[in-house]
Structures are given as C-alpha cells and as structure tokens.
Amino acid sequence: MESIRISIIQTDIVWENKQENLRLLHEKLQSLRGITEMVVLPEMFSTGFSMQSKMLAEPNSGATITTLKQWAAQFQLAICGSYIATENDQFYNRAFFLTPEGEEFYYDKRHLFRMGREAEHFSAGDKRLIIPYRGWNICLLVCYDLRFPVWSRNVNNEYDLLIYVAN
C-alpha cells in the first residue's frame, strides 16, 4: 500500500453559484499541483447545503462532474466531495470519488439531516461504497452519516480509510 498525500479543502462557498465555486476550486487545484494526490471537498461544495434540489441538481454526466473529471486527469489527483444529483426523477446528496485514470464512484447519503429538512428534498441512499484506490480501500460517507456509527462499522476490515465529506 503506497502513501497518499491528501488535501482537505474548506472554502467560503458562494451560495448556489456553481460556476463561481468551480472557478474558486480551480484556483486552489492549480496551487496544489504536484503537492497532493487526493483532494477532499466539502459536502455540496458547488452550491452550499441548499435544499433547492430541483433547481440545482445535475446527472453524473452534468457540467460539475464532467469538469471535475477533467481536472482530476489534468492535475493527476483524485477528487472527492458531494453535490446535488438527480437520477430517475429522484434527488440525492451524492458523494463522488473521481480518479486521474478516469474511474468514477458514487455514494448517495444514507442518513439525511431531518432538522435541516434534507429528507423533504432528497432521497436517501441504501448502499455503502468501498472504493479501491492505489492499494487502499476507502469508505466514502457524507456528513450526518457520522451520527450513525453502525453504518460505518468496519466489519472484517473492509476498508483502510474512512472519509466523511461534510459542510
């Protein structure tokens, strides 16, 4: 198992402004060129923790993920975070893990934050995800999932690294 240099990016997210948030992220990625091998972004990094799912959702083939896949290849690093996704007429707080080799992995947040009314605007996921990356098995979860430790229990040492993307 090789080591992985990880950078955790926390920014002042511009509320519901995908283009500006992507522009700001691009600046940060340029400054990290050659310094890191994985970048962890906040939950809903491109919009803020918005409940405007119908207005802001994109499919996995949308502009946000397409742009991030290009940057993962360009900057030779893995990128993970979450965004507002749509699939089969449902909306998800979807975590993504994109590799420089073009692999893409997705996890839909299981435990929605009821006090923030997230469950009124998003569907919950029902599958945990273990990502194989550079000899590591990575479990990727989202924010409020942290409050439910049974969901992240490492039975039979399934994963080596647990990442929670949070806001």
Segments the model singles out, each with a brief description of its role:
Residues 2-8:
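Extreme N-terminal starter segment of soluble prokaryotic enzymes
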Residues 3, 37-46, 158-167:
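Short acidic, glycine-rich surface-loop motifs adjacent to enzyme active sites
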Residues 8, 41, 143:
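Generic enzyme active-site microenvironment
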Residues 10-15:
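Short polar catalytic/cofactor-binding loops
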Residues 17-21, 118-119:
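Short, solvent-exposed loop/turn segments at secondary-structure boundaries
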Residues 18-19, 26-100, 105:
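Cys-nucleophile CN-hydrolase/nitrilase-fold catalytic domain and related Cys-dependent amidase chemistry
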Residues 57, 86-157, 161, 165-166:
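Active-site catalytic loop in hydrolytic enzyme cores
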